[in-house]
Every structure is written in C-alpha cells, then in structure tokens.
Regions:
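Acidic, glycine/proline-rich low-complexity segments that act as flexible tails and inter-domain linkers
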Residues: 1-63, 72-76, 80, 227, ...
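A generic, well-ordered mixed alpha/beta core segment in the N-terminal half of proteins
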Residues: 48-116
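Glycine-rich anion-binding loops and their surrounding alpha/beta cores
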Residues: 34, 39-45, 101-107, 112-261
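Short, small-residue-enriched loops and turns at beta-alpha junctions
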Residues: 23-25, 57-61, 87-89, 132, ...
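Active-site-proximal beta-alpha loop/turn segments in soluble metabolic enzymes
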Residues: 18-22, 95, 156-164
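Catalytic-loop motifs flanking and including active-site residues across diverse enzymes
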Residues: 13, 65-69, 95, 174, ...
C-alpha cells in the first residue's frame, strides 16, 4: 500500500492490484496493514474527536436522515468528524451535496476542521483534501467498472483517532472483517449494515451491531422499531430533511431512523 500511496506504481499495476484484491476479498489483517500505511502518511494534528463518521456510499431509497442524527448528536455535545469521497455514482444523494443546506461545515484543511469542531462539534472534510492518493483510487471506480476495496478501506481510517469509529458496510459478510480490522488497530468501533451503506439504522428491519471495545469483540441484535415496513418515497426531496429538522412535518420513518441511529 505504501508504494501505491507514494505513486511508485504504474496505473495499470494499480488497477490490477485493486481488482485482484477485490476478487480474492481483503482480510482483516490486510485492511489493518493498509490503514497503518495511510495513517503513517497523514499530517493530522491532535484533535479531540468522539465519533469518526465516514460517509462514502450515498443514499438512493431514502433521504440521508443520518445527517440529522449527526447534527442532533453534535448539538448535545458529541464531537463528530465526518469524511467522504465525493458524489461518484449517479442516482445517489451524497453528504457533500447537502452540507450547505444543513449548515454542516465543509473543511478544506485540518485547521478549519479544528475550528469547526470547536464551534459546532461537527465537521466534514473531503478525503481528497487530506489523502489525495486514496481519493484517486476511489475515483478509478468508473474506469475499472467495479467497486474496489478502497471504498471499504476509507471507512476504517479514523484519521483523527476518535474515541469510537462508526462504519456501515452494506454487503453481507464484510461487517465482521471490518470490526476485526479495527480491533487489530486498537480502535473502538461499531459496524452496521446501514441503510444504503451509510451509518443509518433502518427501523423496519432487525439490525446487527458488530463491535470492538478495548480489543474485545462483541455483537448485539437490535429489533425492528416498526411493526410493518414503511413505503419508500417516490422521490427524494432535500426540503423534507429541513422540514423535519424544523419540526414542520411528522414522518414516522425518519423519526424512528433518527432515534435508532443516535442510540
């Protein structure tokens, strides 16, 4: 991974490596090793953070209610660092597209991250601002025609060493691998299969939590909060996020999703 980050391989070698790793599937040990290589190249200052909140998937069936959960937690004093890799797939709604509307600070460097956390307890930063080599690998998705393991790796980074890392892995079988990788790194983590691949509990289904605390793995099963499934909206209207945040509308699905995600 160090050679990839330092630009010491050809583009064809990089693509071949990523696709081979995707085919064989990355192990917890490999993910932990890759993360160590990335962290050793970060120049992040010591900034106290409670939650590391990666946001790389985007939503397509429901609005990104997790953003309101993050805002509510920040308002209660929880310091949250969010990071993402841009709107890389058509037809999905990404965190970056809603930052201004929801008054979430978008930070270009670590100094503005620190200032935003001091003022708002919430800061977002684009991966390309602080690890451009990794962002370039994510951007190869359209060229390669496949999601590479870098999309998974970005969720483990926890670049500021938050007290707890949150991760959402949508594809079955990968959640435990991510939990184990974070455990190997000495991080406290909670991994879920969040709605759309984002850190958002779906209140209509049972949720399994894969955790690691102090190097000890644990599992929890959370029951569905709704007795029946909600009908998915015909379209995603960002104004509905704002209306719910202001208390102008009642909507059981996002209200339950917010409660479960904040818990």
């Amino acid at each position: 991974m160090g050679m990839l980050l330092d630009g010491k391989v050809e583009d064809t070698q990089l693509g071949a490596f990523l696709m081979l790793l995707r085919h064989k599937e990355e192990s917890a040990e490999e993910l932990a090793g890759f993360t160590e290589a990335i962290r050793s190249r970060l120049s992040a200052p010591a900034i106290q953070v409670d939650l590391d909140w990666p946001s790389y998937a985007g939503k397509k069936r429901h609005l990104p209610w997790y953003l309101l959960a993050a805002k509510a937690l920040a308002a209660s004093g929880v310091r949250i660092f969010m990071h993402g890799g841009g709107a890389h797939t058509a037809g999905r709604m990404y965190t970056e597209q809603l930052l201004e509307q929801l008054d979430i600070p978008s930070c270009d460097d670590w100094q503005t991250v620190e200032a935003a956390l001091a003022k708002h307890n919430l800061a977002y930063s684009y991966l390309g601002n602080w690890m451009p080599a990794l962002q370039r690998m994510i951007d190869l998705r359209n060229t390669l025609g496949l999601r590479s393991p870098i999309h998974s790796l970005a969720r483990i980074l926890n670049p500021l060493g938050a007290r707890c890392g949150l991760q959402s892995i949508f594809h079955p079988g990968y959640q435990a691998v991510h939990r184990d990788a974070s455990g190997l790194l000495g991080d406290n983590v909670i991994v879920i299969k969040g709605d759309g691949g984002e850190i958002e509990i779906n209140p209509d289904t049972t949720s399994h939590l894969y955790g690691s605390t102090g190097g000890v793995s644990w599992d929890e099963e959370w029951p569905a909060l709704s007795a029946q499934r909600h009908v998915k909206p015909a379209s995603l209207e960002p104004e509905h996020l704002l209306a719910l945040w202001r208390g102008d509308v009642e909507d059981s699905y996002p209200q339950l999703a917010l409660l479960a995600t904040m818990a």
